[in-house]
């Protein structure tokens, strides 16, 4: 039986991690369950409530977003200022049977970078924190 933990705040998230008696799988939008290094665990820690832009300073090229923020939302916001993600995350939605390209956290967790990484760098080079 799968146990789903879905904290709604950073304090609740910290408590889930602190109280964990066994490993859990992290999940944002759940679009890349087979990519990266999947954890086999009956516990799922959902980050679905951690969405949206926290900080966006286009002049400084700074963006902070919740782990489950859809890539489409981030790309739309950046496009309004003629900006884009330098590492060009690939969209595996149709390959993985999803209707969404996924979330920022999923791209970072799976280490996904597209063809622009040659000039712009991989996603870890653009992520702090």
State the predicted function of each range.
Residues 105:
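ATP-binding N-lobe of GHMP and related small-molecule kinases
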Residues 1-24, 47-100, 108, 112-129:
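N-terminal glycine-rich flavin-associated loop
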Residues 25-32:
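Glycine-rich beta-strand-to-loop/alpha-helix junction loops that act as flexible
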Residues 33-39:
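Short glycine-biased active-site loop of nucleotidyltransferases that positions the nucleotide triphosphate
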Residues 40-45:
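Short, well-ordered secondary-structure micro-motifs within conserved domains or adaptor modules
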């Amino acid at each position: 039986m799968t146990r789903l933990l879905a904290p709604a705040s950073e304090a609740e998230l910290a408590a889930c991690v602190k109280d964990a008696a066994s490993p859990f799988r992290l999940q944002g939008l759940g679009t890349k369950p087979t990519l990266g290094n999947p954890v086999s665990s009956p516990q799922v820690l959902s980050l679905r409530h951690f969405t949206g832009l926290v900080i966006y300073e286009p002049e400084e090229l700074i963006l902070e977003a919740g782990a489950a923020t859809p890539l489409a939302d981030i790309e739309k916001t950046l496009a309004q200022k003629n900006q884009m993600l330098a590492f060009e995350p690939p969209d595996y939605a149709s390959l993985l049977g999803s209707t969404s390209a996924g979330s920022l956290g999923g791209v970072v967790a799976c280490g996904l970078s597209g063809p622009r990484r040659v000039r712009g760098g991989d996603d870890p080079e653009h992520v702090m924190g």
